[in-house]
């Protein structure tokens, strides 16, 4: 049986250590109460006194059904998890003397990656003495970024790292949303 972290996060009823608490809830006047009166009010309503913000002075407590409260918190956390999108980085490799057809083919793929909402990391790989053509590689990557200007924005300009010259492009947010709605 796994332990529920969410239940350990909140103190309820007699676990609350403060002498005074600010009470909020649907059926309660919002103000500061002594802990004994707040517990009595929760008992009369057959609900729990839940410490929501223990760091506040005085701590904020809510009169609510504890099981329902935990359920709502879990539901809220799941919704937040769904909203977080995983960032996927697609890589495209060029050589320093990439032909026009190869370039257009890779450009087409990069456009589709950016439309899907993925980042694109394009790099020119220099082998042996081809490192002498690093200016050509930089020109190629800048042209690549310029051709993808409508689909994404440059996140990192071309940098030489070892035998690779790398550029990173991120999708434009507004463009992604409008393209997804069209489908």
Swiss-Prot record:
Where is the protein found, in the record's own terms?
A: Cytoplasm
Which terms does the record give in the GO molecular function aspect? ribosome binding; translation initiation factor activity
Q: What's in the GO CC field?
A: cytosol; membrane
Instruction: Fetch the InterPro entries from UniProt.
Output: T_IF-3_C_sf, T_IF-3_N_sf, Translation_initiation_fac_3, Translation_initiation_fac_3_C, Translation_initiation_fac_3_N
Q: Which UniProt keywords apply?
A: Cytoplasm, Initiation factor, Protein biosynthesis
Which Pfam families does the record cross-reference, listed alphabetically? IF3_C, IF3_N
Q: Which GO terms describe its biological process?
A: ribosome disassembly
UniProt subunit comment? Monomer.
Q: State the family it belongs to.
A: Belongs to the IF-3 family.
Q: What does this protein do?
A: IF-3 binds to the 30S ribosomal subunit and shifts the equilibrium between 70S ribosomes and their 50S and 30S subunits in favor of the free subunits, thus enhancing the availability of 30S subunits on which protein synthesis initiation begins.
Q: Which PANTHER family match?
A: TRANSLATION INITIATION FACTOR IF-3, TRANSLATION INITIATION FACTOR IF-3, MITOCHONDRIAL
Can you say what this protein is called? Translation initiation factor IF-3
Please tell me the species this chain comes from.
Answer: Azobacteroides pseudotrichonymphae genomovar. CFP2
Q: What is the lineage of its organism?
A: Bacteria, Pseudomonadati, Bacteroidota, Bacteroidia, Bacteroidales
């Amino acid at each position: 049986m796994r332990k529920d972290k969410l239940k350990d996060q909140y103190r309820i009823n007699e676990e609350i250590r403060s002498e005074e608490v600010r009470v909020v809830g649907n059926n309660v006047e919002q103000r500061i109460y002594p802990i004994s009166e707040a517990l009595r009010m929760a008992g009369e309503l057959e609900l729990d006194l839940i410490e929501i913000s223990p760091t506040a002075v005085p701590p904020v407590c809510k009169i609510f059904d504890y099981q329902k409260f935990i359920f709502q918190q879990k539901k809220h956390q799941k919704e937040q998890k769904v909203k977080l999108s995983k960032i996927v980085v697609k890589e495209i490799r060029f050589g320093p003397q990439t032909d026009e057809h190869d370039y257009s083919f890779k450009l087409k793929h990069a456009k589709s990656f950016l439309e899907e909402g993925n980042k694109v990391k394009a790099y020119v790989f220099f082998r042996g003495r081809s490192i002498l053509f690093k200016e050509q590689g930089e020109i190629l990557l800048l042209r690549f970024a310029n051709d993808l200007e409508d689909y994404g924005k440059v996140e990192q300009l071309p940098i030489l790292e070892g035998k690779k010259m790398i550029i990173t492009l991120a999708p434009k947010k507004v463009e992604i949303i409008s393209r997804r709605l069209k489908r």
